[in-house]
From Swiss-Prot:
Domain of life where this protein originates: Bacteria
The keyword S-adenosyl-L-methionine belongs to this UniProt entry's keyword annotation: no
Transmembrane segments: 33-69, 77-100, 124-141, 148-166, 215-232, 253-281, 288-309, 330-349, 355-376, 422-438
Membrane topology value: Multi-pass membrane protein
An MF annotation (GO) of this entry: antiporter activity
Keyword Isomerase (UniProt): no
Entry-linked NCBIfam families: PRK05277.1 (NF003640)
Residue span of motif Selectivity filter part_1: 106-110
Sequence ranges marked intramembrane in UniProt: 109-116, 177-189, 193-201, 387-401, 402-404, 405-416, 417-421
Protein name, UniProt field: H(+)/Cl(-) exchange transporter ClcA
Topological domain ranges for the Periplasmic compartment: 70-76, 233-252, 310-329, 377-386
Stretches assigned to the Cytoplasmic side: 1-32, 117-123, 167-176, 202-214, 282-287, 439-473
Keywords recorded for this protein, A-Z: Antiport, Cell inner membrane, Cell membrane, Chloride, Ion transport, Membrane, Transmembrane, Transmembrane helix, Transport
């Protein structure tokens, strides 16, 4: 009996020693091994949650569409039901954001940028459930939003959660795991690991602290999230447009013209986003009831729009291959483009939990395809393929709006598996970025972050002014 007790005690002592060794390793924040191990954990978690989010959104969409199919033969039921279902789903998202986690509204990417500079708080315990469930509601309603913004914010918050769980206290670990989660989130959303890395390095370059450990951690997290994504979804590109022909050298000037067009469109689009945000803010004034009802009305309209013109609703991933294949006329492409600009502004600027990457990619595809089809008529001697201009346009609007040309180029090439178009992509995206900068356009996410910080400072100043005199001394 004594032998059994001594054996049990010895086993317990060994377990406790192992736990203590692991705990001490994790608390040595500057140990590269500890941070890289945590980066792998963050990347794996982000990949799993990203896949779960994608499946959950698809499930909600299928349930909604299935309910509409059941009454498809009864128009007097179909139209009201389409409005009501989408309105209710959207209202869930708006309510959760406004009531429990206002920082979960919109794409969430500016929040991560602010957190990397220690200017915005990361409250993962409330952002994670609100962003996940709220995103299920708004994206499931058929609103013109993407899932990449939510997965980037979810990934960043998972990074902070892991940091808190393992009690890693250094500023370097806090910064590195937050950036790792954000990069892994973009990779998990688009199956684009290299774009996830470039997004952190390029788009978040003012906030990201370059050093050997942080770069290795970002690489590690992105690798793990990509592996998880491919285990569940396979290795095929998420946008199937087929293998397009190369762009002959004598046609490259046309891609520069396309870049110039997007260089003009990008700043205008950004300005419209900000103006629409101001319009919604004046309308609801922060009042939750008005905000939720407004969101329900927008969601319901998207539900109706999905019946009238399915291509004008939703994130746009289903629209991109159809448009790139040249199945629409130039006039119809421009009509859908204008319609989706309006719906993108309404959905994104209203503060719904959802991203703007996917809608921008769809807009770029529409305008790029229209340009390619028109160029094919004007220059028949070139034997142009409109799909190549669609691919170039996908990255160009993002480059002009977000001011991240490298990320736009690599993201589109990874998503479509058309790496042979890298030269026209570079020409188009570089032209769009340079002209947008020349015209005075500001990067969209940086501008949104600046407005958020200004609002935060104003609220803090008002709070300090209203506080009793004794509290300020």
């Amino acid at each position: 009996m004594k032998t059994d007790n001594s054996t049990f005690l010895a086993q317990q002592i060994v377990r406790l020693r192992r736990r203590d060794q692991i705990r001490r390793l994790m608390q040595r924040d500057k140990t590269p091994l500890a941070i890289l191990f945590m980066a792998a954990v963050v990347g794996t978690l982000t990949g799993l949650v990203g896949v779960a989010f994608e499946k959950a959104v698809s499930w909600v969409q299928n349930m909604r569409i299935g309910a509409l199919v059941q009454v498809a033969d009864h128009a007097f039921l179909l139209w009201p039901l389409a409005f009501i279902l989408s309105a209710l789903l959207a209202m869930v998202g708006y309510f959760l954001v406004r009531k429990f986690a206002p920082e979960a509204g919109g794409s969430g990417i500016p929040e991560i940028e602010g957190a990397l500079e220690e200017l915005r708080p990361v409250r993962w315990w409330r952002v994670l459930p609100v962003k996940f469930i709220g995103g299920m509601g708004t994206l499931g309603a058929g609103m013109v939003l993407g899932r990449e913004g939510p997965t980037v914010q979810i990934g960043g918050n998972l990074g902070r959660m892991v940091l808190d769980v393992f009690r890693m206290r250094s500023a370097e670990a806090r910064h590195t795991l937050l950036a790792t989660g954000a990069a892994a989130g973009l990779s998990a959303a688009f199956n684009a690991p290299l774009a996830g890395i470039l997004f952190i390095i390029e788009e978040m370059r003012p906030q990201f602290r370059y050093n050997l450990i942080s770069i290795k951690a970002v690489f590690t997290g992105v690798i793990m999230s990509s592996i998880v994504f491919r285990i569940f979804n396979g290795e095929a590109p998420i946008i199937e447009v087929g293998k397009l022909s190369d762009a002959p050298v004598n046609t490259l000037w046309l891609y520069l013209i396309l870049g110039i067009i997007f260089g003009c469109v990008g700043p205008v689009f950004n300005s419209l986003v900000l103006r629409t945000q101001d319009m919604f803010q004046r309308f609801h004034g922060g009042e939750i009831k008005k905000w939720v009802l407004m969101g329900g009305a927008i969601g319901g309209l998207c539900g109706i729009l999905g019946l009238i013109e399915p291509e004008a609703a939703g994130g746009g991933f289903n629209l991109i291959p159809i448009a790139a294949a040249g199945n629409f006329s130039v006039g119809l492409l421009l009509f859908i483009f204008i319609t989706r600009v309006v719906t993108t502004l309404l959905c994104f600027s209203s503060g719904a939990p959802g991203g703007i990457f996917a809608p921008m990619l769809a807009l770029g595809t529409l305008l790029g395809t229209a340009f390619g089809m028109a160029a094919a008529v004007l220059f028949p001697q070139y034997h142009l393929e409109a799909g190549t201009f669609a691919i170039a346009g996908m990255g160009a609007l993002m480059a002009a709006s977000v001011r991240a040309p490298l990320t736009g180029i690599v993201l589109v090439l990874e998503m479509t598996d058309n790496y042979q178009l890298i030269l026209p992509m570079i020409i188009t995206c570089l032209g769009a970025t340079l002209l947008a900068q020349f015209l005075g356009g500001k990067p969209l996410y940086s501008t949104i972050l600046a407005r958020t910080l200004a609002k935060q400072d104003a609220e803090q100043a008002a709070k300090n002014q209203n506080a009793p005199a004794g509290e300020n001394t």
